[in-house]
Regions:
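Gly/Gly-Pro- and Ser/Thr-rich, intrinsically disordered tail segments characteristic of DNA damage-repair
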Residues: 1-232, 283, 365
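Short Gly/Ser/Thr- and Asp/Glu-enriched loop/turn motifs at secondary-structure junctions
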Residues: 109-113, 151-154, 290-294, 339-343
Length: 366
């Protein structure tokens, strides 16, 4: 008989992350694809990128945002399918309804990820472990799986959710946060990208435990005021509140722009830059469950001035193949041969919201 854990004290924050969500929905609708490498993101012969893939495909090295040609080389036997985003929104809405049934505090991060406040006695009637297990079982009954991490704050919950994927459940009970975090690499904590990780490595800081013990003055000299915040998070001491759906604000636009180290003068180079920026916007739209109806193209020139052009689409979309093609048509209106382009940007707005959307436009992993 298992040992009964002590009563949970303090906040209990969970992070529910649907496992390889787009691929899981495709396999739900096509049972014959289960157990086989599956790639969502168009055609193997296209010049696009992988949106997501099944865990079977990941064993061959395929991952999100990988060029389709490289994915085909790594896994030639994979099944390819275009995304069916209306269907993904439908299943996501069912999952979010389960979360809302368990707690009034649900903060949707993306179409396949949400924070939940399951603090016992405040927003949930039972120990967080029981609530998380019930959520996992209810989601699995829909035909997809999720991984859940629970801890005292968002940082701990997020890291915990990634420890045992897919279909995992990791609980970090109060008082055990530092022991759980100490041996993990600094890259396990969100907000530490490649640049920050490299700077920490130069300081011989490789783990969250080492980060938590670093002198405040040393971190401040490298990262400024963010250094102490990083150290507090590495100690598991972050204070973070889950914001309910009713309190979320709507995103007005999703855009991406780039300033070039050297001015672009050839139309082909400008088109390639716009296409690359558009792929990023498309991924962010899909992660946030947004479809936009207005395309905006922005250029700035070497002599300081700039121009923008907009066009409204007949139907909202999150497909970069559609809105990038429109942006390239708009290029004729604001660029002429001989112009030196210093900056290019592309954006989508006028959203058809698929449920409550959080304003934080973050990349997420499956």
């Amino acid at each position: 008989m298992g040992v009964t854990p002590p009563p949970w004290t303090g906040p209990a924050v969970g992070l529910m992350d649907l496992d390889a969500f787009f691929a899981s929905v495709e396999m739900l609708d096509h049972p014959e694809w289960r157990g086989k490498p599956l790639i969502v993101g168009g055609d193997a012969d296209s010049r696009g990128v992988v949106s997501t893939c099944s865990y079977e495909a990941r064993r061959f090295g395929v991952h999100s945002a990988m060029p389709s040609a490289e994915a085909r080389r790594l896994c030639p036997q994979a099944i390819w399918t275009h995304g069916h985003f209306d269907r993904y929104h439908e299943v996501s809405a069912q999952v979010m309804a389960i979360l809302a049934d368990e707690t009034p505090r649900v903060e949707r991060v993306s179409i396949d990820e949400a924070f939940i406040d399951i603090t016992p006695g405040r927003f949930a009637p039972e120990d967080p472990l029981l609530v998380a297990r019930r959520i996992s079982d209810r989601v699995a009954a829909l035909g997809v799986t999720c991984s859940i991490g629970v801890g005292c704050n968002k940082t701990v919950a997020k890291i915990a959710s990634e420890r045992d994927k897919p279909f995992g459940l990791t609980i970090v009970r109060p008082g055990t946060e530092q022991r759980f975090l100490a041996a993990l690499p600094v890259s396990a904590m969100s907000g530490i990208g490649r640049s920050a990780e490299e700077r920490l490595r130069r300081m011989r800081i490789y783990t969250l435990g080492e980060l938590s013990r670093a002198p405040e003055s040393t971190l401040a000299s490298i990262f400024g005021v963010n250094g102490e915040h990083m150290r507090q998070r590495a100690l598991g001491l972050e204070i973070s509140e889950v914001t309910s759906l009713d309190e979320e604000r709507e995103v007005k636009s999703v855009s991406n722009e780039r300033t070039f180290a050297k001015d672009l003068t050839e139309r082909g180079d400008i088109e390639a830059a716009i296409a690359l920026l558009g792929e990023s916007v498309g991924r962010r739209l899909r992660r946030q469950g947004l479809t936009g109806a207005t395309v905006t193209l922005k250029l700035k020139y070497s002599y300081g001035s700039g121009r923008t052009a907009q066009r409204r689409l007949p139907h909202p979309t999150d497909d970069e193949n559609i809105f990038v093609a429109v942006a390239l048509e708009l290029l004729d209106n604001i660029w002429q041969e001989g112009m030196h382009v210093r900056l290019a940007g592309i954006g989508m707005s006028d959203f058809d919201h698929q449920g409550g959307i959080q304003t934080c436009l973050l990349y997420t992993s499956d």
